[in-house]
């Protein structure tokens, strides 16, 4: 091989390696991404069963039911729509009815029940999208710290 051919082989190998690395990173990120939805968005969104998403909203008053063992069912609402959620595990201390929550999981087997494997309780409702805050205010729900609503 001449020097020119060696250089081309090294450059070609480097480009091939870089392309493979970029494709691998893109594939890994596409598998790890969980899009955020509120219940009202799910009626418009086409979420395939088994697709991991984050579901956020308020825990509907009177909806928390404790099942066998550590299984808990509750409903997440954004005042436009409500989604039933099942979670098996220990809930965060701040979890309660009327409080903000983000559940991560998936709809399994075409069921309308969201199966969560992670539940995060929001300690403060002051940081929420303005359209959600406006809907809550229109229904008479009072919010603290309204100067922080975006």
From Swiss-Prot:
Cysteine-cysteine disulfides: none
GO terms (BP aspect): cytochrome complex assembly
GO cellular component annotations of the record: plasma membrane
Positions on the Periplasmic side per record topology: 29-150
Alphabetic keyword roster: Cell inner membrane, Cell membrane, Cytochrome c-type biogenesis, Heme, Iron, Membrane, Metal-binding, Signal-anchor, Transmembrane, Transmembrane helix
Subcellular location, record wording: Cell inner membrane
Membrane-topology annotation of the record: Single-pass type II membrane protein
GO molecular function, one term: heme binding
Transmembrane segments: 8-28
Keyword Iron: yes
Pfam families according to UniProt: CcmE (PF03100)
Sequence positions that bind heme: 123, 127
Family matches, as SUPFAM superfamilies: Heme chaperone CcmE
PANTHER family: CYTOCHROME C-TYPE BIOGENESIS PROTEIN CCME HOMOLOG, MITOCHONDRIAL (PTHR34128:SF2)
Family: Belongs to the CcmE/CycJ family.
Protein task: Heme chaperone required for the biogenesis of c-type cytochromes. Transiently binds heme delivered by CcmC and transfers the heme to apo-cytochromes in a process facilitated by CcmF and CcmH.
This protein's name: Cytochrome c-type biogenesis protein CcmE
Source organism (scientific name): Sinorhizobium medicae (strain WSM419) (Ensifer medicae)
Taxonomic classification: Bacteria, Pseudomonadati, Pseudomonadota, Alphaproteobacteria, Hyphomicrobiales
Chain's gene name: ccmE
């Amino acid at each position: 091989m001449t020097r020119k051919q060696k250089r081309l082989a090294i450059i070609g190998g480097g480009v091939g390696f870089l392309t493979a690395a970029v494709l691998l990173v893109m594939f890994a990120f596409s598998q790890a991404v969980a899009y955020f939805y509120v219940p009202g968005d799910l009626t418009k969104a086409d979420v395939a069963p088994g697709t991991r998403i984050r579901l956020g909203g308020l825990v509907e008053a009177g909806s928390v039911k404790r099942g066998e063992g550590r299984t808990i069912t509750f409903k997440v609402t954004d005042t436009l729509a409500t989604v039933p959620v099942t979670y098996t595990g220990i809930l965060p201390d701040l979890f309660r009815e009327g409080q903000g929550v983000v559940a991560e999981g998936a709809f399994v087997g075409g069921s309308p029940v969201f199966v969560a494997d992670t539940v995060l309780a929001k300690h403060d409702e002051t940081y929420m999208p303005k359209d959600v805050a406006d809907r809550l205010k229109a229904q008479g729900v009072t919010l603290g710290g309204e100067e922080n609503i975006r």
